[in-house]
């Protein structure tokens, strides 16, 4: 989660929210950043000072509960309940209900998580949970899921204190 400052978006965030999605109002064309031209910025949590992400931001919201429940139900093979939760969430955003099943349902849940939780620190864990590569846009470097940096090192005192704990590879 960003603690302070305005976060620049890549066009991927912009493209998936700019149409009929009310979340498009949370993005603006910002200032020039590091000579890269004007950037798209997320203004989701504006502070009284006028800066994004300068004040306390929500830790959990109703939308997260809907999407967590949708994903959990999908994983429990209860696609009907997953679809109900997903459509309840979409209704809160003024989006039309969908009728999906199988992998298409999971992909829609993950897409809504991508849009809803932009700049809140969720995407990394969503990608990690499903073993998907992490695409970094600044600098333009990709981190494959097999890269040892996907997992942080376990504190050495924990490894030393428990013979059943093995240090994550690469550390």
Residue ranges and their predicted role:
Residues 1-171:
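Acidic/polar-rich alpha-helix caps and helix-coil junctions
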